[in-house]
């Protein structure tokens, strides 16, 4: 391979693995700092951006953004009557309570959900997926699952299982 081709391959590899490049800088400039955690954490953070970009592209075809999709899909997979209290929704989503309240208000205005008092507890509220919301989210759920499978197809089944185990263990330790 000629020098120019080797340089081109090296640049392509660097662009694909920005974390590895950054770690090289750390090793060179601050070798006294153990930055080995960056090998995993940095790649998870980078993948977060890559995954969200792909998911957003998929959901945009359905006129959705991820937070509204996550609420509707979570309600849908509860089964009939496709309902949950906001506190239960909040525990399953990565949103603040204020963020969820604003999102639910917009979704109710758009006819995707309804909010009503909880029959079991007059003080509580129940969020329900509407037929309109269900008609939007069901095809989006299929496309979202396709996108997720597309994103992980570069990994063998064994690699996927190993990642699930390792990431689950990390997530368990990160819980407050």
Feature roles, as predicted:
Residues 1-62:
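N-terminal leader segment of winged-helix/HTH proteins
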Residues 85, 172-176:
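Short, charged, intrinsically disordered terminal tails
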Residues 38-41, 45, 49, 94, ...:
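Short amphipathic alpha-helical segments with heptad-repeat character
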Residues 35, 45, 49, 53-96:
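N-terminal helix-turn-helix DNA-binding core of bacterial DNA-binding proteins
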Residues 74-78, 166, 173:
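Short amphipathic alpha-helical elements of helix-turn-helix/winged-helix folds
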Residues 105-165:
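Charged, amphipathic alpha-helical coiled-coil/dimerization segments
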Residues 86, 104-105:
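Short, hydrophobic-biased segments on the C-terminal half of alpha helices
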